A protein has these predicted regions:
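Alpha/beta-hydrolase active-site loop
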Residues: 111-134
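Short beta-strand element of the alpha/beta-hydrolase
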Residues: 66-75
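Serine-hydrolase catalytic core
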Residues: 205-278, 283
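Conserved alpha/beta-hydrolase
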Residues: 89-108
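Hydrolase active-site cap/lid region
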Residues: 24-25, 158-206
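The serine-hydrolase catalytic nucleophile loop
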Residues: 75-88
Length: 284
């Protein structure tokens, strides 16, 4: 084979590889070459949160330096944990922290939607306190939440001035689902539609009564001022959050992206596209 043909074939091959890498529905992963002094790994975390202890874990990135860190917030009750995202993000050079809110999946304390938000604030404080041992770069922490975790992501992002980015996936608009409820019977009928989970230690009546009694706290639109300077992605599989997204977009002075994909609630057929969107957001 002469030199000209070799060069031409090499050029074609590189173009094909480049095109494949550019596709949003493909991803290239490589095994991690362990740093002998600080290899990538995983550790359990026991995090104090308002007098209780919540269980979590950290996927440690490779290397002795402090790493940017993604905090993953699960939904209600949290069957989809998005740990496939965690593995790829860790390989991308980031730490990833996953935890179970108070009163969920064996964590101590009482489960409530408001407590979930405060738990994120407490996890961020934990990262700051143990920044050296956890090797967390506290200047670059990003929140990612799914369903209820999307709501928690936006609510806690509004309370954490040091965290600049949030990715809300299929956000549960808790306020929107209960704003027209007039009686306790209506509230319980609506609450039961979401299931009654033994992995959450709060009865439905106690869990949802604050939503009806104090709706302003649960209304994300009331946090537009605090969220105006943040970088936010909202990604849905339905159009139910379009009004909320429009409100946040109009007030945002930094970066706001809202998309609706043709998929299901856990984004089953779009995992690679989702991971690529997360990575691009982390790198932004």
């Amino acid at each position: 084979m002469n030199t000209t043909i070799r060069i031409l074939l090499s050029f074609c091959f590189l173009n094909l590889v480049g095109a494949a890498l550019a596709q949003p529905d493909s991803i290239v992963l490589r095994d991690i070459n362990w740093d002998k002094n600080a290899p990538a790994g995983m550790n359990e975390l026991f995090i104090p949160s308002s007098g209780a202890t919540i269980a979590g874990l950290i996927y440690r990135a490779n290397g002795v330096q402090k790493h940017p860190t993604l905090i993953i917030l699960h939904g209600y009750p949290g069957n989809e944990r998005n740990l496939d995202i965690a593995q790829v993000v860790r390989a991308h050079g980031w730490n990833v922290i996953y935890f179970d809110y108070r009163g969920s999946w064996g964590s101590g304390g009482q489960f409530s939607f408001a407590n979930c938000v405060q738990d994120v604030v407490n996890v961020a404080a934990f990262c700051k306190k143990y920044t050296d041992s956890l090797r967390v770069d506290t200047s670059n922490i990003v929140l990612f939440g799914h369903s209820m975790g999307g709501w928690v992501c936006l609510k806690s992002l509004a309370q954490l001035p040091g965290i600049k980015k949030g990715f809300a996936l299929s956000t549960w608009d808790i306020y929107g689902d209960f704003k027209d409820v007039k009686t306790e019977q209506q509230m319980m009928e609506r609450a039961r539609q979401g299931g009654n989970y033994f992995v959450l230690n709060t009865p439905l009546q106690e869990l949802f009564k604050p939503v009806v009694d104090h709706p302003s706290f649960y209304k994300i639109q009331n946090d537009t001022t605090a969220l105006a300077s943040k970088q936010i992605i909202m990604l849905d599989e339905h159009h139910g959050n379009s009004e909320l997204a429009d409100t946040l977009r109009r007030s945002n002075r930094n970066y706001f992206n809202y998309e609706v994909w043709q998929t299901d609630y856990p984004f089953t057929n779009k995992r690679i596209s989702l991971i690529n969107k997360v990575l691009a957001f982390l790198d932004k």
